[in-house]
Amino acid sequence: MRNLKRALSLLLSSTLVLGMMVMGGSAAGYQDVDDSNVHQEAIEVLQAVGIMTGKENGDFDPDGSITRNEMAVVMAHLLNLDYDYYRGTHPFTDVPDWAAPYVAACAAEGVVAGIGNGQYGGDQKVTAAQASLMLMKALGYFQNQEDFGTDWQVATIRQASYINLFDNINSNAESALTRAQVAQLVLNALESDMVSFTGDKGIQIGNVTVGYKAEYTAKTGTDKKYNTLVSGKTDISNQGQYYIQLGEELYEGQLRKADDADAFDRPAYTWSYKGEKIGTYVDWTQMVKEYTTAVTGKELYNLLTSNTIKEYGFHYYVDGKESTTIK
């Protein structure tokens, strides 16, 4: 187990949020990714399944950027595309040989598109909007041009935000994503429901589509492999139907996320792939105590217990003023 950081932060203003900043145990990863990296879980899961790997020197380079060419590689590995089959088939004029099979495969599958004038723009850094659109298409969204309305970025960001694709990612639509953020985005997609188009494609009158209505419905299935990722809704009214998440479909139930507890008996979950443990990670959504009214020092003392207070250091803020004393 990695060195444990003994820190616990409290934040108080109109509300108070409490969480112990100690990560759960995980398998060996990269030398530049440790407990302090909020994307450690995503990076290690994607390493285990072979979607994103590190540099030759053993680093993951979490803060490094990722290009559109490299994002095509990520998508090809994510979707297990036979990229060699598509070698030499892409329609773009600016794709280097090393990236050509991946870009070609993704273009053939409708996952990526060019930037105009026969160019793919592969050397450009991939933005949050671009990367999320690729992943949304993998989930089943935006299969028709009409889905975008008048602005593809607005439509993409709106729908991606609605399904929580940007959880744990601090970025805006046109910002270049870091490698760590891309890893988080992909992991979020793996835990998202796949969908089918159930809207109305309308009728074509000249160059105009009339009556088009974009609607998507979550896919369901009865196979137990569709109940291997724990991330909210799974069973539909006890009818044996499970919402199909991307990671369940792609990995045939071999990628698993199960409720667990860490070494401190805190609520956590453990990831595994093909029966091999990837790591155990604290479920931070349950490591929160929120107060919407005034809270006394005694209440905090009773919540934390005297042993915890003796063992850990505390910092909390009341209306912006820092204190470390709990009485």
Segments the model singles out, each with a brief description of its role:
Residues 43-52:
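Mature N-terminal segment immediately following signal peptide/propeptide cleavage
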Residues 2-40, 53-69, 75-101, 108-129, ...:
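Feature responds to low-complexity, polar/acidic, surface-exposed segments characteristic
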Residues 179:
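Extracellular structured ligand-interaction cores
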Residues 277-327:
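Structural detector for short beta-strands of small beta-barrel domains
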